[in-house]
Amino acid sequence: ALENVIEANTLLSGLGFENTGCAGAHGIHSGFSEIESAHAYLHGEKVAFGLLCQLVLENADKKLIDKIVRFLLAVDLPVCLADLNIEASEENLGIIADHTINHNPLIYNEPIVVNEVSVKNAILMADMIGRSYREGKYYL
């Protein structure tokens, strides 16, 4: 069994290298990293909430979003801006969206047209969804 895990890990590492498997979540993570109050959080924590933002940006199925939010909560990963110590101010959203769109090409791996407005809106909607789940008031 261990050999199978090692072999699968090696295979997936090679496949991941081919396209890095990176898109919106990593692009948005990069924007979060521009906010000083979020510097204490780990890469994976920022990508976790970035994934929720990506799903909103892609207009993903509500059942998938529900499943992801519940998983993130179960493993104590961020589901809203406050979980990353980021205030949802226009200034912060502008910094995040600008960096995501203009300084990190990963966002352009998304199969949709993205711009600063769509990124800001996705972050705000993901934040609202995450906060509602965290408060026990399910949005979906």
Outline where the language-model segments fall.
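Active-site segments that bind and position negatively charged phosphate/pyrophosphate groups
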Residues: 1-74
